[in-house]
Amino acid sequence: MQFPAPLKSNSIKFLLLGSGELGKEVAIEAQRLGIEVVAVDRYPNAPAHLVAHRSYVIDMKSKEQVLEVIFREKPDYILPEIEAINIEALFEAEERGFRVIPNAEAVNKTMNRKNIRKFAAEELGLKTSQYRFVSSFEGLQEAARTLGFPCVIKPVMSSSGHGQSIARNEADLERSWEIAKEARGDASELIVEEFIDFDYEITLLTARNETGTVFCPPIGHIQKDGDYIFSWQPMQMSETALQKAKEIAKTITDGLGGRGIFGVELFVKGDEVYFSEVSPRPHDTGMVTMITQSQSEFALHVRAVLGLGLGFTFYTPGASAAYKAKHESFTPVIEADESVFDQESFLRVFGKPESHEGRRMAVVLTLAETAEQALQKANELIAKVSDQ
């Protein structure tokens, strides 16, 4: 494959729709191959804006504005990095010959929990929790009574856990309803899920293109309010469960098709594995791969997009701990104790231009002989990070 210089008439060009911390790492990996990177987001100086050749600030939900950037830039590949994008623009771009990663229909299915759950459970026959879709509080009450308590309630469209809650009894439903309605994204319809008393949950990063499909070692993670706070790799699991996880991941990613990396989220109980969700892009829990693998999830994504081989080496166990802001600031500062910077730990500051309470601003990455030791170390070091 040839790699022309960027900013030339024959450059290979990526258009990132969404420019957060994951998009930033994709941009960096793309630039390592001389790819011209254009980053788009709804606010200025987003993380990927800071490392791109050019950037745009637009309303990502506006079909006209998204298409205007696509037609102006004429990218070789369009990489949606967030859910909140006008899907009609992606379908039209694809119809006009632009290559959407992995493809517009996969983005459409995965940005909406109703679409992907119906596709996974009803079309592909994958094992999932029981579920109902509701659009009124009365419908929520009826669904919760049918499925039983506790139950999980989420908007059909939201990202990073926004709007997600667990109702443990009838009295919790009103609060769950309000949480869902306040979420970013479309909260006009909710999914109510049976609560699976799982042993643990994993992300199985799955990269695919015409050269084949590869699986990264499973990543364990801990969520709070539906958003990841810790992850570690590898997650210890039985060979039977791991094989089932790979079969589910292969089925769902083959069903969606296209090139790229997918974050397949799964619940595991004993040797039983349940499909939860899938993201057709790098996954936040996968930031740990920046130090555990010869090719991070971001490098694998870029290679998959370009049709390159997907081989990699798993180096060593590791863990990640997300740092969320505790203060509101238009001039945020991340502070870290010197002990965070030892030979087997790393701090990645995302460079977001503003901090809001609970906004993810940085991540600590740690290596150790075991994933458990790495997780313990990450937990200790994240306590030595602060913001102002």
UniProtKB/Swiss-Prot annotation:
Pathway(s) served: Purine metabolism; IMP biosynthesis via de novo pathway; N(2)-formyl-N(1)-(5-phospho-D-ribosyl)glycinamide from N(1)-(5-phospho-D-ribosyl)glycinamide (formate route): step 1/1
GO cellular component: cytosol
Pfam families hit by this protein: ATP-grasp, PurT_C, RS_preATP-grasp-like
Enzyme Commission identifier(s): 6.3.1.21
Entry GO MF terms: ATP binding; magnesium ion binding; phosphoribosylglycinamide formyltransferase 2 activity; phosphoribosylglycinamide formyltransferase activity
SUPFAM superfamilies: Glutathione synthetase ATP-binding domain-like, PreATP-grasp domain
A Gene Ontology BP annotation from the UniProt entry: 'de novo' IMP biosynthetic process
Superkingdom as given in the UniProt entry: Bacteria
Listed InterPro entries: ATP-grasp (IPR011761), ATP-grasp_carboxylate-amine (IPR003135), ATP_grasp_subdomain_1 (IPR013815), PreATP-grasp_dom_sf (IPR016185), PurT (IPR005862), PurT/PurK_preATP-grasp (IPR054350), PurT_C (IPR048740)
Sites where the protein binds N(1)-(5-phospho-beta-D-ribosyl)glycinamide: E21, L22, E81, D284, K352, R359, R360
Catalysed transformations (reactions): N(1)-(5-phospho-beta-D-ribosyl)glycinamide + formate + ATP = N(2)-formyl-N(1)-(5-phospho-beta-D-ribosyl)glycinamide + ADP + phosphate + H(+)
Domain ATP-grasp: 118-306
Record keywords: ATP-binding, Ligase, Magnesium, Metal-binding, Nucleotide-binding, Purine biosynthesis
Residues where ATP binds: R113, K154, S159, S160, G161, H162, G163, Q164, E193, E194, F195, I196, E201
Annotated NCBIfam families: PRK09288.1, purT
Function: Involved in the de novo purine biosynthesis. Catalyzes the transfer of formate to 5-phospho-ribosyl-glycinamide (GAR), producing 5-phospho-ribosyl-N-formylglycinamide (FGAR). Formate is provided by PurU via hydrolysis of 10-formyl-tetrahydrofolate.
Subunit structure: Homodimer.
Family that this chain belongs to: Belongs to the PurK/PurT family.
Name this protein carries in UniProt: Formate-dependent phosphoribosylglycinamide formyltransferase
Native species: Nitratiruptor sp. (strain SB155-2)
